[in-house]
Amino acid sequence: MNLNQYYGTGRRKTASARVFIKSGISNGRVIINKRTLDQYFPRNNTQSIIIRPLKITNLLDKLDIYITVKGGGISGQAGAICHGMTRALLQYDEKLRGVLRSVGLVTRDSREVERKKVGLRKARRRPQFSKR
């Protein structure tokens, strides 16, 4: 029984995820920070973001996935895991690149929070203007 491990790092906003894919003897488990997917992300929309690369490549129940994720919030962590999983899947099988690229999962989402400016309330929100 050949047990292979593949690794991918994903980032989104301030979150970073390390994804380990193990093939061989597997039953489709997804473990995030030593908790199951349902325990770590109880909402269905974040679960679907994470599982998306596996569904597209039809590998949902064929691989065991172990993830450690740090920083950011729920959305950022889900995006980081998705990106890391895509990179690990590309290590697992380079032929998946075309399928994952067509859906837009290979490219990192580089959007970051814009910094707050001096004299403004937020990044772009100005104080209320009074003519008189």
Curated annotation (Swiss-Prot):
Keyword Ribonucleoprotein carried by entry: yes
Q: Which Pfam families match?
A: Ribosomal_S9
One GO BP annotation is: translation
Q: Which domain of life is it from?
A: Bacteria
UniProt keyword Transcription regulation present: no
Q: Name one GO cellular component term.
A: cytosolic small ribosomal subunit
Family, similarity comment: Belongs to the universal ribosomal protein uS9 family.
This protein is called what?
Small ribosomal subunit protein uS9
Q: Which gene encodes it?
A: rpsI
